[in-house]
Curated annotation (Swiss-Prot):
MF (Gene Ontology): cytokine activity; frizzled binding
Record lineage: Eukaryota, Metazoa, Chordata, Craniata, Vertebrata
A GO biological-process term: canonical Wnt signaling pathway
Major location (coarse): secreted
The entry's keywords: Developmental protein, Disulfide bond, Extracellular matrix, Glycoprotein, Lipoprotein, Secreted, Wnt signaling pathway
Database matches in PANTHER family: PROTEIN WNT-3A, WNT RELATED
The protein's name in its UniProt record: Protein Wnt-3a
Length: 123
């Protein structure tokens, strides 16, 4: 009689919330960069450096950018964005659907509607 031992190892993804929080932290601390062109023996080379000298150079794990994101609060025909004006928001939410964030700090109007609809209920 023989015995058999099976050992299984695998990697698993962290919880989606953990990944989202990690990426949000990276986004919030992203470094703005500028592209510098300089001549080397093989021709022109482009490198990125921090836009402001008082910031340390980013590491390989830091998030960097060299163009500002568009302002999604305002309409932009080039990108097809309608902006956030007249959007429905959630007054009680502090998330992305909340009025403070969605209305870009412009304030919001509260409107109460009463509707009469057939509900097709069966009793």
């Amino acid at each position: 009689s023989g015995s058999c031992e099976v050992k299984t190892c695998w990697w698993s993804q962290p919880d989606f919330r953990v990944i989202g929080d990690y990426l949000k932290d990276k986004y919030d601390s992203a470094s703005e960069m500028v592209v510098e062109k300089h001549r080397e023996s093989r021709g022109w080379v482009e490198t990125l450096r921090p836009k402001y000298n008082f910031f340390k150079a980013p590491t390989e794990k830091d998030l960097v950018y060299y163009e500002n994101s568009p302002n999604f609060c305002e309409p932009n025909p080039e990108t097809g964005s309608f902006g956030t004006r007249d959007r429905i928001c959630n007054v009680t939410s502090h998330g992305i659907d909340g009025c403070d964030l969605l209305c870009c700090g412009r304030g919001h109007n509260t409107r109460t509607e009463k509707r009469k609809e057939k509900c097709h209920c069966i009793f």
